Amino acid sequence: ETHNIAACTVFRQGHVGRLASYPLMAARAGMIGMAWADSGRSPKGVAPFGGRAARLGTNPWAMAVPSDLDGPFCMDFATSAVAMGKIKLAEARGQEVPRGWIVDKDGELSTDPKAIAGGALLPLGGPGEGYKGTALAAMGEVFCGILTGLGFGVEPTGRHNDGCFLIAIKVDAFRPLLTFRRDVAEFAQYLKDTPPAKGSSGVLYPGEVEHIAERKRGAEGVEIEDATWKKLGALAAEGGIAERLGFA
């Protein structure tokens, strides 16, 4: 608010959770927000382009800007081909994953989510253009690991200690906020007015698909696969609260 731009680093933290939550806080305050996170000195899950062993984290990147849209104009994605959670979800559902997401312990492409054990996620761009995801993930390590003093690589005896880099930019320091918000909304509509490609239902602005899903789940509830539900039930029973939560 005072100096128009601010940045900070965080390290030796636990899991950051939903990374977009922090840029969205900035957007609601009339600022552009950005957040980057790495996996600290914890075990890695992503093989750099051209390699078969994990040396990078999924290192997500999130940004959000103020707008007059119904939903937030934002992005939040891993710099790997896919977030690790989607691999675990496919395994829990007994489903295969698309080819190009993971490699097994021998560096071979696999569609079996269980192959991630001893294998690795591929970087954003997959086997063909993964150098792009590798570059983004490596920059994430610099901002969240080296700039913070946390370091890089794996410390086997260390605790979970992720790093973060966050920045907020006051829009009013550059342009009137109301004008900026209007222009972002008009830009989003300009994108949505793009003639759809064959087989496409149309273009969505960044963050729109999550906004649609949030409204739907708010009205209809959140779908949870059986394997996860059983785990939750077991934890509730272990804690003596299964009946109170409706598991019994």
Per-range role (PLM):
Residues 40, 79-82, 171-173:
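Glycine-rich beta-alpha junction loops
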Residues 142, 153-248:
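Catalytic-core signal marking the mid-to-C-terminal active-site face
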Residues 6-11, 123-125, 166-172:
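Short glycine-rich or small-residue beta-strand-to-loop segments that form or flank ligand, phosphate
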